[in-house]
């Protein structure tokens, strides 16, 4: 695990330096052929790198060193950057939270790919392969998932390849706006999300609550229900304008955007 920790830290520091140098927040100075340094306040980072065709500095993470001899850790780089950019304590804390969440996700990715060689990756199911990709190449903390704890990450983050069902609620039609393609109606939506057995269970729940055509079923991400809808729409739930149905239907696999889900039951 320590080897993975060192690797993701080196890769993160390289990404921070390269991205902010490209955006001209930091300035790289050539030391010799293919060897550079970047200063952040009183700290200096040195590394081997080549300048790409679009100006991007491709840093070799394994060559990163600090002038002080300190360990190569992304936390130190962020604290140095906070001084340079004059971040407030609150801003630094928020970025630190996103940093550590991203490092955890990157470690999980490395662990998930440990036993996969190039041939295995080529033959991997495309949706499974999506889960093993590194995410946005330029967004530095691309796995921040602010508000997600370890349980939520294991359930819903793509690198964990967890499968989950949607959480459904019913909402009175006059309380929402229904918008869809001409060839898609509510029955088509339900058919795309649950098999016959699940549809029977869903219909039984619908009838149990005495719901009729004046209501519409709405699918929700389970985290969205737990953390947002059940709390921020408490008034609608209390007044009976929204009714919780529960989890129904097929299992889904999260893609890189988190909000994009692949139906894992029908592949």
Locations of the language-model features?
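Nucleotide/phosphate-binding site architecture used for ATP/NTP-dependent chemistry
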Residues: 1-267
């Amino acid at each position: 695990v320590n080897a993975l920790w060192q690797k993701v830290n080196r890769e993160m520091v390289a990404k921070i330096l390269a991205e902010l140098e490209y955006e001209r927040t930091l300035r790289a100075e050539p030391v010799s052929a293919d060897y550079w340094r970047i200063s952040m306040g009183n700290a200096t980072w040195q590394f081997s790198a080549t300048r790409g065709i679009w100006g991007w500095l491709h840093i070799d993470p394994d060559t990163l060193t600090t002038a002080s001899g300190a360990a190569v850790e992304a936390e130190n780089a962020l604290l140095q950057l906070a001084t340079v950019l004059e971040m407030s304590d609150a801003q630094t804390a928020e970025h630190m939270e996103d940093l550590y969440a991203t490092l955890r996700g990157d470690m999980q990715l490395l662990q998930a790919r440990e036993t996969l060689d190039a041939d295995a990756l080529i033959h991997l199911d495309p949706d499974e392969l999506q889960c093993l990709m590194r995410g946005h190449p330029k967004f530095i903390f691309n796995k921040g998932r602010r508000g997600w704890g370890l349980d939520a990450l294991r359930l819903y983050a793509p690198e964990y390849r967890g499968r989950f069902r949607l959480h459904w609620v019913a909402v009175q039609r006059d309380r929402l706006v229904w918008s869809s393609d001409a060839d898609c109606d509510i029955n088509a939506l339900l058919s795309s999300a649950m098999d016959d057995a699940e549809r029977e269970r869903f219909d039984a729940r619908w009838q149990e609550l005495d719901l009729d055509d004046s209501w519409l079923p709405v699918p929700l991400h389970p985290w969205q229900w737990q953390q947002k809808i059940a709390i921020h729409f408490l008034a609608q739930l209390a007044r009976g304008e929204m009714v919780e149905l529960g989890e129904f239907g097929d299992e889904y696999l999260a893609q890189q955007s988190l909000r994009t889900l692949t139906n894992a039951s029908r592949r």
